[in-house]
């Protein structure tokens, strides 16, 4: 009897072991599937020099070396301080036309950044290009510039509190579109500068203001214009001073007493950041950046979509220090304007902008005094972007190589990045055009993932394959190669795919860089995307309709189904 019981328990134990091993294989194969690849249209770009090119032949030799080693595009700061320096609406694009011509001769694509910030004074800056001097006569310094907690005034970029921002950017974007329409075939993407160093943030960590790493930096909303905006926002939220006092536990007697934090580090060490007042301030502080992104995004879509028909992107800074400081958690991120990444990235989606994130090469080291967690931060931001269907492009924060390229490979494959841009050209190409020692590692870990021949599945080089998760039983796709001619409404019926519940279609887009499309049921019932069309890049994508009329999402690659998982092994054990 005892022997029989022992055999039973032994069999139960082995069954449990088999189950655990099976689960391990299952989850392991799921992880490898989810982390296996970049997006189907992944390409590699390299950032050009900050300062003006003076030797065009040498520059062309550098570009040719990039082309010969698998790089897709050169990314370039198009400095506002150069092109409109002579006066309001007095543009000179001649330098950048020469630049674009040189890039074209080398066989590369060109990705311009409309750089509405100053070059000089930040990490990696080797030039001095201020904003156009005439600009400051358009309004007061209090409206147009930043002021921090200590009173330092910063004019790296225009303050989002100035009402003239939209008009100035609209004029700049319109002139660029007019002057570079003839170059549209070589421009696969356009980036917008959202603030200092081209990033959507406040100038919270600026060495000239006294900042040094790893200090938290300073809040930047101490002009009278900014403080007035905060008061207005709080009055709008609560309705009256009495209700503000009730929410904050204060005894303010005048609206003028409503103010951004005035206690420096004490805002954190005293816990102010974690009470209702602190949360209201930090949420509003970020919302100013969100509104700014909406303004510049709308101006960009208005001017660029009809001419270029390409994706437009903007960048969030990888503020990775002070993240896990027990007394001042996330304080550096907060000073830069990042309080709620989920909400911030949703604004990218709502504005139909791609997201560039930086510091992909860095490793965590979360100990004092830096409390630096860049790898964790990349994971956080990338995961949120993936969940919302926001396209991702990566960058390195500092010069890198070797293990840094390995880290980049880990991130771009784990989160299905659509592109990576290396900072900067002199990291992998010498001035004489010869490759540096880092070129080999860059090719082995990053460039090798580029998709020069479409999606790798035998489709034409410039084709788009779309899997449509059926919201409509018989979906139609109304489309055009971006900038081309639309199909007749309702478009083309999408046939069923090899995957149950999905339709599928492959479309050749010729020389266009994207497919512009909308979906319907063939009977004038249209998929809602806030009255905007969807854009698909070459390669394979999966489209998932939204619910209750909300916008759908686009994910890189084909759908992941149960058949993608390795079958669980059957374990037969003798006992």
From Swiss-Prot:
Catalytic activity: Hydrolysis of (1->4)-alpha-D-glucosidic linkages in polysaccharides so as to remove successive maltose units from the non-reducing ends of the chains
Signal sequence extent: 1-36
Binding site for substrate: 77, 117, 125, 315, 320, 358, 396-397, 424
Location of the active site: 199 (proton donor), 395 (proton acceptor)
Disulfide bonds: 119-127
Protein biosynthesis recorded as keyword: no
Annotated EC: 3.2.1.2
Keywords annotated in UniProt: Carbohydrate metabolism, Disulfide bond, Glycosidase, Hydrolase, Metal-binding, Polysaccharide degradation, Signal
Superkingdom of origin: Bacteria
One GO BP: polysaccharide catabolic process
Chain residues that bind Ca(2+): 84, 88, 171
Cofactor binding remark: Binds 1 Ca(2+) ion per subunit.
Record-given protein name: Beta-amylase
